Amino acid sequence: MIKYYNRKTKQYEIEKVAGENYLNWTYSSPIGMSFLEALIKKKAFSSIYGSFCDSKISKGKVKKFIDSFDIDILESEKKPEAFKSFNDFFTRKLTKEARPFSTNKEILISPGDGRLLVYENIDLDNLVEIKGMGYSLKELIKDEKISSKYKNGICMILRLCPTDYHRFHFVDSGVCSATSKIKGSYYSVNPIALNKVKRLFCENKREWSILKSDNFKDILYIEVGATCVGSIIQTYKENTKVNKGDEKGYFKFGGSTVVLFFEKDSVKIDEDILEQTRLGYETKVFMGESIGKK
């Protein structure tokens, strides 16, 4: 059971997990763990399932998924019958009205939909996925010079589950560097998996870049792949001016994670999010929602 905080209702809610029985079996049974290490975490498995989700055959999954998880399809630019495949639905674009955001330069917005944890005054050598399982930023991006910039800064972890909108955006205007890609495995990023696989973010496929933002200093973006996420698609133009709210990229089918690092004293995160993180709960947020101030 995964409990998260709804900041609008100020209540805790239970996450409806896509494939929960599969996740519990895979990460909690000896046979499941054997399959995980031998096949499921491999690129080939995610590539094969990704090809299925790109095919016309997978279109039949769309309506059932929408109904099972109460997806608000009215937010989508396309109607359900217009999707050509499950991935076409999964990577759907939303109407501009669906995710409004403040143009105030002092306001920091969420880069996407998901469940958010934020850590302040971070120790670069002991970043935490869950209690007792740490890793270093240097291990995560394999660049010591870049890592050192974020000493005592802020780490923001946005977990996207399969039921979420899967495009991610720029939280500020600025210029974004080219993307560095790091090969890795394809473990699930669900808390069920995080409790079982040590240093999971350092094991999974991931990509990173630097947004030289106009208002929040240099922001490190890291996109982490997961089971069945055969592709992390970057849609922005490197070393070219971007605007706040512009799309940066998207994930194909599967749960995924966007991790942002901020330099010390560059932003103050909203207290309710920090408090829930201290209590061990993620906070549900939507792309464009205000989550902090300069």
From Swiss-Prot:
Pfam families: PS_Dcarbxylase (PF02666)
A biological-process GO annotation: phosphatidylethanolamine biosynthetic process
InterPro entries from the UniProt entry: PS_Dcarbxylase, PSD-B, PSD_type2_pro
Lipid metabolism keyword on record: yes
EC assignment: 4.1.1.65
Family: Belongs to the phosphatidylserine decarboxylase family. PSD-B subfamily. Prokaryotic type II sub-subfamily.
Name by which UniProt lists this protein: Phosphatidylserine decarboxylase proenzyme 1
